Amino acid sequence: MKFPSILLAILLFKPITARFTPLGIDEFYIKPCERKIVYTTDKHDKCLMRRLEIEMDTGENQGYVKCVFKEFGYLNGEGQFNKQALLKDYHQAGFKNKDKAVLESYDGCMKNYGPTPNAMKILDCVTKDKDFPKVINARRERNSDWKPDWIQAYCGVTKLF
């Protein structure tokens, strides 16, 4: 019988995802990066993208994350990750004594992936640090252009103001 073997194959197949729990990053709206989101993407997925809670390593997601990282100043012109820009954000958010821990966490994670320009892998490594959401939320608070207004918001209006 083919049906039981197909059912078993489906049950054993587990898609790989990067996020199982919310990061705690508030929704942000970066206008140039919105063009990277396919117009057919539903509101829930757009909400997750804007919170950097991206699960699948697709071309759309890579393009969006790469754009966000460029806007943050985390990628240089060659697409390489700028660790100093990340540390600068940590310092501005009040985490001045975490440089070594942040860099060790990032470098250790990237060692598993090997050298790669893949923005999704960089996102995975950057978000390993538990304080990264606080850093990004602090940066969002400093830049009012990154706060979506009620028309642009996909995640609800409770966290907008």
UniProtKB/Swiss-Prot annotation:
Disulfide bonds: C33-C67, C47-C155, C109-C125
Main location: secreted
Residues in the signal sequence: 1-18
An example molecular function term from Gene Ontology annotations: odorant binding
Gene Ontology CC terms, in alphabetical order: extracellular region
Location in the cell: Secreted
Domain of life: Eukaryota
Sorted UniProt keywords: Disulfide bond, Secreted, Signal
Function: In contrast to the related D7 salivary proteins, does not bind serotonin.
Family under the similarity heading: Belongs to the PBP/GOBP family.
Designated name of the protein: Short form salivary protein D7S
Gene of this entry: D7S
